[in-house]
Amino acid sequence: MALSSPSRILCFALALSAASLSLSFASSHDYSIVGYSPEDLESHDKLIELFENWISNFEKAYETVEEKFLRFEVFKDNLKHIDETNKKGKSYWLGLNEFADLSHEEFKKMYLGLKTDIVRRDEERSYAEFAYRDVEAVPKSVDWRKKGAVAEVKNQGSCGSCWAFSTVAAVEGINKIVTGNLTTLSEQELIDCDTTYNNGCNGGLMDYAFEYIVKNGGLRKEEDYPYSMEEGTCEMQKDESETVTINGHQDVPTNDEKSLLKALAHQPLSVAIDASGREFQFYSGGVFDGRCGVDLDHGVAAVGYGSSKGSDYIIVKNSWGPKWGEKGYIRLKRNTGKPEGLCGINKMASFPTKTK
């Protein structure tokens, strides 16, 4: 399936099937945040115009008219789901983002990449060594973005490298906290070089990436080893290359939200979630409490927590670019009463350690 190409189709020549979509967005008057308005959905021609505007906004291109027709049909189906969800007036809303021309199965195959089948966690040892075990009180809210410990949102693209982005975000955070320097680091080095247990664009695990950084003597800066959205040959480190080091890593006790907040109050964390839900694909804003399982398939970073209108949440940094969610972030509801947390966020959190 070709989702982009250098050539652009100049005209939408097929006689597209007119579909009657009775759509409205009842829960918000600011339609700009979801990417469509009722006027866009009043006629077949306006629906096509909406699709063309979306193509331009996200710089999409299709190799054939047939492919464009197929993507339009998927787009309409996704739009129907988005609008039906928004009409329910939930605490979050969905929008027409970069993934609006992908079926849900295509999306999961292309953008999720955590490999939990290679997990090795010693739960008793994890709790015994947990650095923040004896912390008694934490602030009501923490946002590491405001403390300058979170780099700009990045985009993994269609490479299943979420594990590398999750790892890097946590290392960038602790490095800023300890040294005062926010240094943007290389996910590509992990993809190309951390191959003992991790599998590049075919998934991996954050704990193994932390181990690689320790054994390798650090991780290079992004500018010295830029992201290419594909697996490459590991580039040997040059003597003049600057690296950021860590001393080790620790796991947060499993299914323990209090412990997760204790750690998160002190530094950004690598966390794993179940991001396979269709509502997660199109999340655009608000405190998310939608349907999702606990089968971990996506690595992200927890960078804070807080409350809004009585809803407690965890601030999660994703790696799907700044046009997804709230400028690349999602607020996941916490205090759900389930030990594993919403989308399994309490199941497998970890963090790097650094003393100097």
Curated annotation (Swiss-Prot):
One of its GO terms (cellular component) is vacuole. The active site is at C162, H298, N318. The keyword Cell membrane applies. Pfam families: Inhibitor_I29, Peptidase_C1. It is an enzyme of class 3 (hydrolase). One of its GO terms (molecular function) is cysteine-type peptidase activity. Its EC number is 3.4.22.-. It is found in: Vacuole; Cell membrane. Disruption phenotype: No visible phenotype under normal growth conditions, but mutant plants show increased resistance to infection by the bacterial wilt pathogen Ralstonia solanacearum. Keywords: Cell membrane, Disulfide bond, Glycoprotein, Hydrolase, Membrane, Plant defense, Protease, Signal, Thiol protease, Vacuole, Zymogen. Mostly expressed in roots, stems and flowers. Confined to tracheary elements, and specifically to xylem. Glycans are attached at N181. Residues 1-26 form the signal peptide. Residues 27-137 form a propeptide. One of its GO terms (biological process) is programmed cell death involved in cell development. Interacts with PRN2. Cysteine protease involved in xylem tracheary element (TE) autolysis during xylogenesis in roots. Participates in micro autolysis within the intact central vacuole before mega autolysis is initiated by tonoplast implosion. Involved in susceptibility to the bacterial plant pathogen Ralstonia solanacearum. This is Cysteine protease XCP2. The gene is XCP2.
